[in-house]
């Protein structure tokens, strides 16, 4: 039932599969010679719906692959050459054959390329699997990456643009060697490499991808059934676990599809040919050792004929004759070089016809050592079946595999698989490592003919433990499988438990990677005699005897052959290969492992002799050391340690299981913690959201429950109804008017008589409209009152915004007035100077004026952009003119009337300057000194203040000074002097004392002043009233001109009256524009809402330039300059006497009066601009 004949035409067919071909089941191609019944058949699976080509690699891809695996190739070449040289030196008679084999291996650009497949039909039964094994022996460490996809009909080529994996989309990354998304899908013995360029977003996508990659075997329904598990490999811990979250899938993830089905479910028998070993290493793991294939030489098709390949003597180990890459195992030893499929064991196949068949399964010698570090859960069967190596003489058992992982190597024997004894010993538990995860698919493809036919001797085909643990995570778990009855306990079976549980053959079946893996443990302690060895049909002594069968050979005692010659040849080959293995291991892997298995193997060699029959005695004694623990002592005591071996192995196995369980527990706890954290975070989020929602809902409800809001809503609804009614009435009235006009035109032009009913109808409509309109008008007052109630809040707000700054200003001015009065009284008390009665008379107008100014909200307003006037501009030049005449008007200062008030201001300034000097040194004094200084300074200030009022004696009259006089700072508060836009410090500051002294002297009301613009706008007004455009460079000149004007013309304008007469300037400073506009809007709103209510008088904005001009113009016509000059001279004389008593005041005063710099403010003088009433008023408080 071989399929090789069907492959020959397929091989000669065009290389690409058509879409129609894809609908047929995959072809299962054999590497080991297509002819001869396909006896070397290796299963190849073509991917359905995928076009595959014989040569998919482009030259660039091949070169890139070689470049990527350059390092591994170099190492592999070195090891292979060393091994071949060793073989040639050991077997000089076969040097030519070895050299040819070596050359063939070198010729292959990539040792994975299955070029020989194209010539399989010409090789017949002769080429031998040795050649192919040699070609396939290079298991690159990047095997899944760098294998030549030229020959593989599996559709895994990166360059295969015809591959149509469902979730894929082609991108530029496809051309890169290491595509960003590579998935390895394992099902049974097949591995598919898939390039994923998009994230697998759901399990359905993954199911579709898997079903597409395995179309003949898996469907979406099967994948979603509970009998199917999808496992993903944890590379860090080298275990497979069930895939629950597709986000775990990453680049280079290995996904295994596990079908919990009967043994044959997935693989019909027609796919198997003569039970040959079809498990070539098609996909070795990426980490696999480059040399693991060197010795994987398994029987070629000549095994079917029972004769060695023609070119090689039968004495040569079959590993040299026939290389079966089929049995190699793919180990996923996360990151480590996995061991080889099995030791280089070459057993003579036993056939009924007696013709010896060199059946050997020879893994890389280095694999024996490599396997020791493979972790429990390396599931390899999905990629390639391990060899079933029956535990023969025990010389070649894999000690590390036995101890560390329960891997079975399968070597299918020719013959009926089910003719094996009824004991049910499917596989002797030989090299436990060789079948790491040997799936049912693997077993069936290899052993259908030799394992699964009905056994003549009876006995359970599957042991009691079949399916006992469906998804075992590691082969170690196989030891727990219950054994079928019918045999003595296996005293040293690698995984056998206590003898009471033992059985002649314990079978453990792993359901894994798509179907069940069969693990049969063969108790090495099974008693077999030489006689039973010679009996062909003895069930206990033969594993798979039967007519025309080959015995299963592998690690462990050789199966008793029916032919003594076959047995002897097997033993001889076993010994030779054992010694070879030891030498090669020591040569290639010297120091790589703590102990070399060569000791064990040679020790086991001593346990059996070439002439020893394949009896149970030799078998039990030989099998013990090989399955013993790794230490060499195990091999040195071949017969004495079956129990110790079993216990030690069980301990190691149990320890591994405990570690795995503890790891799983830790992961489970982590998952629980994560879940709890997620729950907490979700709870917190829900609480936050709930609180936020409840707050918003309560806020909305509160807004609706707010009586004002409810009333506003009701009033708005009523207003809308009113407007609708009004609109309706208007419309009806329009219609009525039109109809009446039409009737009138008809009557006037056409002299048509209008019928009475029509007129009555119009009259009725008009009457109804009148009534409705009357009702509407009657309804309006109620609506108006309601709206006023609702809008009262807005009206109050507007009023508040309008009046509050003025109210604050008024309160502030009253405070200033009280302060001035108190200071004056105190000074009078201190100095004993009492004001004359006429001065007292001037106080009452002050208070009256202050109140009237406050009530009328009239202030001297200075916008922020223009700095306040400086005392030096008003007073300084006058002083300088009187003392040190300057410029072209040396006598103008004598004409000014306010000499005494100027001198009083000078004394105030002297006191202030003295205070600033002391304040600058405040930090140097203690608290006592500070208090003393404060008292002195306050006394000096209070002494200077009454002099200001002396002007009132000489100039009685209305004095609206409190409006404009900033409060004195008794504690010496100061602020930075204001700076002009041109950069000059406030050279035009208007200090309070100067204003106070000048105002009383402004008797006649001035004419309406011209509007002027602040100098910051580049506009100013000259003495004659002309508007001059100036730049910043001219600002100094303008200020000088203004100061000269003020020298000549001392302002006599009554500010209150002047301000009230001045219309609002058309061009207000920029900062004032918005405020004035807002005030206009507020005035309009209030005027509309308050029917008949008086609106607040608008603000008047007067720029400092305008006030200066007004003062100058008003002063021009002053008639009593001479009187003022006399008063000033008298006051100056008195003041000089007062200052003589105070040296500090005298010094500062002389500096102020005589220094020509007195026109500019001192650096320490400061003025605080007071911004009130929306920034409209800007008075300056100077110290």
Curated annotation (Swiss-Prot):
<feature type="modified residue" description="Phosphoserine">
    <location>
        <position position="13"/>
    </location>
</feature>
<feature type="compositionally biased region" description="Basic and acidic residues">
    <location>
        <begin position="369"/>
        <end position="379"/>
    </location>
</feature>
<feature type="region of interest" description="Disordered">
    <location>
        <begin position="1105"/>
        <end position="1183"/>
    </location>
</feature>
<feature type="compositionally biased region" description="Low complexity">
    <location>
        <begin position="313"/>
        <end position="331"/>
    </location>
</feature>
<feature type="modified residue" description="Phosphoserine">
    <location>
        <position position="517"/>
    </location>
</feature>
<dbReference type="GO" id="GO:0045202">
    <property type="term" value="C:synapse"/>
</dbReference>
<dbReference type="InterPro" id="IPR051825">
    <property type="entry name" value="SRCIN1"/>
</dbReference>
<keyword id="KW-0175">Coiled coil</keyword>
<feature type="modified residue" description="Phosphoserine">
    <location>
        <position position="143"/>
    </location>
</feature>
<feature type="region of interest" description="Disordered">
    <location>
        <begin position="949"/>
        <end position="1032"/>
    </location>
</feature>
<feature type="modified residue" description="Phosphoserine">
    <location>
        <position position="53"/>
    </location>
</feature>
<feature type="modified residue" description="Phosphoserine">
    <location>
        <position position="179"/>
    </location>
</feature>
<dbReference type="InterPro" id="IPR022782">
    <property type="entry name" value="AIP3-like_C"/>
</dbReference>
<feature type="modified residue" description="Phosphoserine">
    <location>
        <position position="503"/>
    </location>
</feature>
<feature type="modified residue" description="Phosphothreonine">
    <location>
        <position position="52"/>
    </location>
</feature>
<feature type="modified residue" description="Phosphoserine">
    <location>
        <position position="343"/>
    </location>
</feature>
<keyword id="KW-0966">Cell projection</keyword>
<dbReference type="Pfam" id="PF03915">
    <property type="entry name" value="AIP3"/>
</dbReference>
<feature type="modified residue" description="Phosphoserine">
    <location>
        <position position="513"/>
    </location>
</feature>
<keyword id="KW-0770">Synapse</keyword>
<feature type="compositionally biased region" description="Polar residues">
    <location>
        <begin position="286"/>
        <end position="296"/>
    </location>
</feature>
<feature type="region of interest" description="Interaction with SNAP25">
    <location>
        <begin position="647"/>
        <end position="697"/>
    </location>
</feature>
<dbReference type="GO" id="GO:0006887">
    <property type="term" value="P:exocytosis"/>
</dbReference>
<dbReference type="GO" id="GO:0061098">
    <property type="term" value="P:positive regulation of protein tyrosine kinase activity"/>
</dbReference>
<feature type="modified residue" description="Phosphoserine">
    <location>
        <position position="307"/>
    </location>
</feature>
<feature type="region of interest" description="Disordered">
    <location>
        <begin position="1058"/>
        <end position="1081"/>
    </location>
</feature>
<dbReference type="GO" id="GO:0034446">
    <property type="term" value="P:substrate adhesion-dependent cell spreading"/>
</dbReference>
<feature type="modified residue" description="Phosphoserine">
    <location>
        <position position="844"/>
    </location>
</feature>
<feature type="modified residue" description="Phosphoserine">
    <location>
        <position position="1043"/>
    </location>
</feature>
<dbReference type="GO" id="GO:0019901">
    <property type="term" value="F:protein kinase binding"/>
</dbReference>
<feature type="modified residue" description="Phosphoserine">
    <location>
        <position position="362"/>
    </location>
</feature>
<feature type="modified residue" description="Phosphoserine">
    <location>
        <position position="45"/>
    </location>
</feature>
<feature type="modified residue" description="Phosphoserine">
    <location>
        <position position="225"/>
    </location>
</feature>
<dbReference type="GO" id="GO:0014069">
    <property type="term" value="C:postsynaptic density"/>
</dbReference>
<feature type="modified residue" description="Phosphotyrosine">
    <location>
        <position position="396"/>
    </location>
</feature>
<feature type="modified residue" description="Phosphoserine">
    <location>
        <position position="500"/>
    </location>
</feature>
<feature type="modified residue" description="Phosphoserine">
    <location>
        <position position="169"/>
    </location>
</feature>
<feature type="modified residue" description="Phosphothreonine">
    <location>
        <position position="884"/>
    </location>
</feature>
<dbReference type="GO" id="GO:0030425">
    <property type="term" value="C:dendrite"/>
</dbReference>
<feature type="modified residue" description="Phosphoserine">
    <location>
        <position position="987"/>
    </location>
</feature>
<dbReference type="GO" id="GO:0098974">
    <property type="term" value="P:postsynaptic actin cytoskeleton organization"/>
</dbReference>
<feature type="modified residue" description="Phosphoserine">
    <location>
        <position position="496"/>
    </location>
</feature>
